[in-house]
Swiss-Prot record:
Protein name: Carbon catabolite repressor protein 4 homolog 2
A GO MF label: metal ion binding
Lineage: superkingdom: Eukaryota
Keywords of this entry: Cytoplasm, Exonuclease, Hydrolase, Magnesium, Metal-binding, Nuclease, Nucleus, Repeat, RNA-binding, Transcription, Transcription regulation
Length: 603
């Protein structure tokens, strides 16, 4: 007969909006064990599995700490408590919790004061009156405005909860195997029940197998990143559906390495809470972030093949995006093709139509290079060094929106978008440079045939000032560049061949163009390295901080209108590094708004 062996949840901490899928191991009538579902519609020898989810409701309300969601709140910031949008961020589990989080928490006060009226600005000054603007002084002032949360002691993992016993009641909230917590579940424990039932009588057979979760927590909500105009206009805009500052004829491009699930190991990112590192949570948080940017073109890296087909393509399709994908060429981990990641490019169907797609496999280029230039005795060594399974996805799109320059035939504007993920191994400087040069040569051919604006996006795994970065933005590499010393296969010689004719410029260098002023621009210039004109970082982990991600564009056909604001390192360090509960990748998203300009002939 059918029986349940055991059940458990991959994550003990349920989050609002994040689907819970229990692991259920059953023994079939033939004595074999399986995790396959046995629904009422397909019973086994007259029996099926019945599922129930319950909310454990208590007469006692429990409030959760906004910084440590597994802890009960004991303090509340008075300033935040009076502003509805900040209430979820107002709770803290201890004075130390509030003190440690103050550097980030203070920015919430400042942002609220700036975005609302002068009265709130006065409140901020009163709250911080004990200091002169220093961290210690400001914190002292706000500590005096903490209130004690009216919550008695309550165990984090309740035990022996039964229906209508001791002020607690079970409220059925779901009848499927999976359940997605709602806002009504916040601060409550959930109970999952799995039991074998008779298909004919519907009667329960045996005892149910149950799990109690910890208390449901709200999904962390990072402060929205703003779109900063860099074309001389004053002001800042939100990237929301009802108030986009994007003007007619312009378009936005997003580039984001989302950190594949196979790469998100607890060993590498032990500082990130397990629930925030789990794929079910990160998936939901990444989708919410990506959809929220409402970019016209989205370039993602490290998208696993199964996640593209099962999650990203169908979910973004609901928001009007068409999807294109190129996976890497080698299998990883268990050898499953689903574990291979790649590059995914999405575009809004109401803004663009698909014209052409090019797949770039650096492995094939490596094979051709080896066959042509490497002596037979060195071919195996050369292939071992060059074959790294990296790829690029190039798409040509036709604009559907107005106010775009057209060619003499009257056709709408074409735009070429390259999305790539270059080799990560830092010692293979020659391989990185060769991959970037190979991509640029391919883009040059497309540009020569169509003479269209070009965008080159992705994770290049190379720092500003490196040989690959220099080649991209300068069109050549100084023969004395130190990176060129690493060339055991002589694939970079002669160095004079390391050139290209595309007038590429990094979009984020627009933050430091002379003569451009605007609200908030000076603040964001401080997040740019003035030696390289690139962001101080796009990748921030415990052991590394630096810039690996870029959006390049051809400056003779495109101009930058706006840029997505960069993140502040101090704000990220409150969670040690990335990924974190608020930001679910070890990289940050980059986004730029462009406008096509009248073509000038490339010489």
């Amino acid at each position: 007969m059918l029986s349940v062996i055991r059940v458990h949840l991959p994550s003990e901490i349920p989050i609002v909006g994040c689907e819970l899928t229990p692991y259920v191991l059953v023994r079939r009538p033939d004595k074999n064990s399986t995790t396959d579902d046995v629904p009422e519609s397909a019973p086994l020898e007259g029996y099926f599995l019945r599922y129930r989810w319950y909310r454990v409701q208590s007469d006692k309300k429990v409030t959760i700490c906004s910084v440590h969601p597994t802890e009960q709140a004991t303090l509340q910031c008075v300033f935040c408590s009076k502003r509805r949008s900040l209430v979820p961020k107002s709770y803290h589990c201890s004075p130390k919790c509030f003190t440690d989080a103050w550097q980030h928490h203070r920015t919430l006060h400042e942002r609220a004061a700036a975005e609302n009226n002068a009265n709130e600005d006065d409140d901020l000054n009163r709250n911080n009156s004990a200091g002169s603007g220093s961290l210690a002084g400001s914190l002292s002032g706000s500590m005096s405005n903490l209130s004690i949360a009216n919550n008695g002691p309550a165990p984090f993992y309740p035990s022996n909860i039964t229906q209508k016993n001791g002020g607690e009641t079970l409220v059925e909230v779901g009848g499927c195997k999976t359940y997605t917590p709602t806002a009504d579940d916040i601060s409550h424990v959930l109970k999952f029940e799995c039991v074998v039932a008779n298909a004919e009588t519907k009667q329960i057979v045996g005892h149910p197998s149950t799990i109690l979760t910890s208390r449901v927590i709200p999904a962390p909500s990072p402060s929205p990143r703003k779109l900063i105009p860099v074309n001389g206009a004053d002001g800042m805009g939100h990237l929301d559906q009802d108030a986009r500052i994007q003007s007619a004829g312009s378009f936005t491009v997003l580039s984001y390495n989302i950190l594949s699930d196979t790469s998100a190991s607890s060993d590498l990112y032990s500082y990130c809470p397990p629930w925030a590192l789990s794929w079910p949570y990160r998936r939901q948080n990444l989708l919410r972030e990506i959809v929220g940017y409402r970019a016209d073109v989205v370039c993602l890296q490290e998208v696993q093949s199964d996640h593209f087909h099962e999650i990203f393509a169908p979910e973004l399709d609901k928001h009007g995006y068409q999807a294109l994908y190129k996976r890497k060429t080698n299998e990883v981990l268990s050898g499953s093709t689903s574990a291979i990641d790649g590059c995914a490019t999405f575009f809004r169907r109401d803004r663009f139509s698909h014209v052409k797609k090019y797949d770039v496999e650096f492995n094939k280029a490596a094979q051709s290079l080896t066959d042509a230039l490497i002596p037979q005795a060195q071919k195996r060594t050369a292939l071992n060094r060059l074959v790294k399974d990296n790829i690029a996805l190039i798409v040509v799109l036709e604009a559907k929106f107005g106010n775009q320059p057209t060619d003499p035939s009257g056709k709408r504007q074409l735009i070429c978008v390259a999305n790539t993920h270059v080799n990560v191994q830092q010692d293979l400087k020659d391989v990185k440079l060769w991959q970037v040069h190979t991509l640029l040569k391919g883009l040059e051919k497309i540009a020569a045939s169509a003479d269209i604006p070009m965008l080159v996006c992705g994770d290049f795994n190379t720092l500003p000032g490196s040989a690959p970065h220099t080649l991209l933005v300068m069109g050549k590499v100084d023969p004395m560049h130190p990176d060129l010393a690493v060339d055991p296969l002589n694939i970079l010689r002669p160095h004079t061949k390391l050139t290209h004719q595309l007038p590429l410029v990094s979009a984020y260098s627009s933050f430091v163009r002379k003569g451009i002023m605007g609200l908030g621009l000076e603040q964001h210039r401080r997040r740019i390295d003035l030696n390289t004109n690139e962001p101080l970082f796009t990748n921030c982990t415990r052991d590394f901080i630096g810039t690996h991600d870029y959006i390049f564009y051809t400056a003779d056909t495109l101009m930058v209108e706006s840029l997505l604001e960069l993140l502040d390192e101090d704000g990220l360090r409150k969670d040690t590094a990335l990924p974190s509960p608020e930001w679910s990748s070890n990289h940050i998203a980059l986004l730029a708004e462009f406008r096509c300009t009248p073509r000038t002939r490339r010489g």
